[in-house]
Amino acid sequence: MTRRSFLAAACLPAFAQDFVTLPPLKANDRIAYGKAAQQFGDLFLPHGNGPHPAVIFIHGGFWRNAYTLEHASHLCAALARAGAAVWNLEYRRLGDPGADWAGISDDIVHGAEHLVPVANRYNLDLKRVIAAGHSAGGQLALWLAAQMAVDLRGVVPLAAISDLRRAYALQLGGGVVGELLGGSPDRVPQRYAAADPMELLPISPPQRVLHGTADNIVPIDLSQRFAKASKNAKLVALPGAGHFDLIDPRSKIWPKVQENILRWQF
């Protein structure tokens, strides 16, 4: 964990600190998809020769560089144990050079597209690929699905910031949505139209929208609004679950989360 990540974790509630400060698990391989230091992915592989289904996973952290892909490593390892390869994407985040919305979204597309050469090398089944993401990563997973840059069987946003206008109104993350997009919905409506999952509907791949009812970081209201607006989404409310329970394999709800992530792949 970097010093920046440690300081960011110290600002979280105690239950969240317990999770995000866990020592990260080592992936089978780390593969660059670009020249910037943040343009890489960690690949977690299941046992066996394959071909393996694959999950493109996008971590959260309010799009800020204080949070890295490392805190998603336990989720990735758990999914690999269950039989899926996981391509855990890192990407430029706010605070990194070139990390405005254009740079961040560009990284997500290029990182996802790089799954093709990765699949050829590691015998992954490109007909059984889904995207999943947590918090800000859930927004990016939905955005990726809307671009149709890669063929996805489904998309699973976990506690996602799936309504950027609502997130701006609530000033989530200290007003991070305005920082990400360079202003309010009234000031830069075209940027919200390009980035907000609510404004990108309909999204073709089916969506399983998971959210904890006790999430005090990203309220379930955002997922409820998105699932209601989407004709291709099902909301899965997880009673009593907090924000980080959805990516913590030690949590009571993890079996339900894993089931929904892998439902289209086996």
Please give the residue ranges for each predicted region.
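Alpha/beta-hydrolase active-site loop
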Residues: 100-119
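Gly/Ser-rich "nucleophile elbow"/oxyanion-hole loop immediately N-terminal to the catalytic nucleophile
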Residues: 114-130
